[in-house]
């Protein structure tokens, strides 16, 4: 008797599966279409043997080229390591590698644009074309405006930390390539408020992604919806059929070990009727202000990303000094 396909195998037939990791071996094993990096994942990569040559090369560059401005040297080495890890990952996946712009720049449109252009140029110098890369930007108003300009330049963007409909709609209007609504962090907020959902169909993170997906499909938006920040395989299964799903290695492993039918939950053909209301900076701000969860989680997410970046830079500074 032929064994039934795993739930991961079935999911691959319904959604593009993305690995939320920079773990080289995990990506080789799990074979996602896309993958993503961030400062935390790059910091973890510093301890992986596969990146040892890259790390030594970039630290040597920092020691040789570092001037009197130690901070600038550390920051440049962090950028070079980030791109170096991305280059290695681009060799493994047939699709895209998301590379995160500094969270410190989340409220600075021009600085975000400049850093994105720099990253794309660094990738090009290392033989990776921009069509292999997504520039990951926090979905503040300033970040969305940066993405609007970058998209016009042919630089595709992944707008992350999406918690609110205003953010999602503003991204679609800006022509953003992809958005990442954070399923698990939305659930975390409501559970902390004592509002645990009775079923997966009432999970506020799942409901949010389904709503955004349906609105985008009904409107004919080309912006890709990629569910992110999952806490369980149940959340993933509840969004089977979403354009893309970025999943941690441990949950990918669980899905690969599970069998049984995995039905499609989202489909363009089943999208609800929806009309978009134009979003400007004022309506964007008021939409966030009226949503305590989104306000808290967006600010907290940016803060966490910034702390992770500073931790990466501190590790690099220590290695350069060692």
Swiss-Prot record:
Pathway per its UniProt entry is:
Carbohydrate degradation; pentose phosphate pathway; D-glyceraldehyde 3-phosphate and beta-D-fructose 6-phosphate from D-ribose 5-phosphate and D-xylulose 5-phosphate (non-oxidative stage): step 2/3
User: What keywords were assigned to this record?
Assistant: Cytoplasm, Pentose shunt, Schiff base, Transferase
**Can you list the GO cellular component terms from the UniProt entry?**
cytosol
Catalytic function, reaction form: D-sedoheptulose 7-phosphate + D-glyceraldehyde 3-phosphate = D-erythrose 4-phosphate + beta-D-fructose 6-phosphate
Gene3D superfamilies, per database record: Aldolase class I
Summary of the function given for this chain in its UniProt record: Transaldolase is important for the balance of metabolites in the pentose-phosphate pathway.
Q: Which family does it belong to?
A: Belongs to the transaldolase family. Type 1 subfamily.
Q: What is this protein called?
A: Transaldolase
Lineage, opening ranks: Bacteria, Pseudomonadati, Pseudomonadota, Gammaproteobacteria, Lysobacterales
Designated gene of the protein: tal
């Amino acid at each position: 008797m032929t064994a039934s396909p795993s739930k991961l195998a079935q999911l691959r037939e319904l959604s593009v599966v993305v690995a939320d990791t920079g773990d080289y071996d995990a990506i080789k094993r799990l074979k996602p279409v896309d993958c993503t990096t961030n400062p935390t994942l790059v910091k973890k990569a510093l301890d992986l043997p596969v990146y040892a040559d890259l790390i030594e090369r970039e630290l040597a560059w920092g020691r040789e080229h570092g001037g009197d401005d130690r901070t600038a040297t550390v920051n440049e080495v962090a950028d070079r390591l980030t791109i170096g890890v991305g280059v290695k990952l681009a060799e493994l996946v047939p699709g895209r590698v998301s590379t995160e712009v500094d969270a410190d720049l989340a409220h600075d449109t021009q600085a975000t644009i400049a850093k994105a252009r720099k990253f794309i140029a660094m990738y090009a110098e290392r033989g990776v074309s921009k069509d292999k890369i997504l520039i990951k930007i926090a979905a503040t108003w300033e970040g969305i405006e940066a993405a609007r300009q970058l998209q016009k330049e042919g630089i595709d963007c992944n707008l992350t930390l999406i918690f609110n409909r205003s953010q999602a709609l503003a991204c679609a209007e800006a022509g953003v390539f992809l958005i990442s609504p954070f399923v698990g962090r939305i659930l975390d907020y409501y559970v902390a408020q004592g509002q645990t959902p009775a079923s997966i169909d009432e999970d506020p993170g799942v409901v949010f992604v389904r709503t955004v997906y349906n609105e985008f499909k009904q409107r004919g938006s080309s912006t890709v919806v990629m569910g992110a920040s999952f806490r369980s395989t149940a959340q993933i299964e509840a969004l089977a059929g979403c354009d893309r799903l970025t999943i941690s290695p441990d949950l990918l492993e669980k899905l690969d070990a599970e069998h049984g039918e995995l039905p499609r939950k989202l489909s363009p053909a089943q999208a609800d009727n929806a009309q978009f209301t134009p979003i400007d900076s004022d309506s964007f701000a008021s939409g966030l202000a009226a949503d305590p969860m989104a306000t808290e989680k967006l600010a907290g997410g940016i803060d966490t990303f910034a702390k992770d970046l500073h931790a990466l830079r501190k590790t690099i500074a220590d290695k350069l000094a060692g």
